[in-house]
From Swiss-Prot:
GO terms for biological process: one-carbon metabolic process; tetrahydrobiopterin biosynthetic process; tetrahydrofolate biosynthetic process. The keyword DNA repair does not apply. One of its GO terms (molecular function) is GTP cyclohydrolase I activity. Toroid-shaped homodecamer, composed of two pentamers of five dimers. Pathway: Cofactor biosynthesis; 7,8-dihydroneopterin triphosphate biosynthesis; 7,8-dihydroneopterin triphosphate from GTP: step 1/1. Its EC number is 3.5.4.16. It catalyses: GTP + H2O = 7,8-dihydroneopterin 3'-triphosphate + formate + H(+). This is GTP cyclohydrolase 1. InterPro entries: GTP-CH-I_C/QueF, GTP-CH-I_N, GTP_CycHdrlase_I, GTP_CycHdrlase_I_CS, GTP_CycHdrlase_I_dom. It comes from Halalkalibacterium halodurans (strain ATCC BAA-125 / DSM 18197 / FERM 7344 / JCM 9153 / C-125). Belongs to the GTP cyclohydrolase I family. PANTHER family: GTP CYCLOHYDROLASE 1, GTP CYCLOHYDROLASE I.
Amino acid sequence: MSKVDHEKIQQAVVMILEAIGEDPAREGLEDTPKRVAKMYEEVFAGLNQDPKEHFATIFGEDHEELVLVKDIPFFSMCEHHLVPFFGKAHVGYIPKGGKVTGLSKLARAVEAVARRPQLQERITSTVADALVETLEPHGVIVVVEAEHMCMTMRGVKKPGAATVTSAVRGTFANDAAARAEVLSLIKG
């Protein structure tokens, strides 16, 4: 999807409003199709981004200890129901060979992956794999905690239920002590 088709989205929103028994021409709804199209362009902007692009700039730094950025806020849209889920991502890696990336790049990669119709599990593994493929670190850990509106406002209706996913690569997959250490840092 290279460009969002605003006209198609607007037509679809009108059809949905009519299908639920609303009048899309009534005050309050008349501009809703345009607003929804604009919103979708923003919230699905990650469809045109490769998270690895954010790691293109690599800095030489003799540091082979943990780098962890935690509590990165994000939002995404559940691909099953097209309703939001949101939470925090924690991204850590142990650099190898003097290859580090900017801290903001970790947050940008999370954002690029989250801004598309998505699954939490896929966000977690995609960010981890992008780091592995570009930086080739000793280890990577990504932990994502989120509340899914598809569980909060429909179906089971359990507000506040948190879903936690993790992806561990390299050292963090093979060394239980290293994994336990970073998980304790994430917990704070």
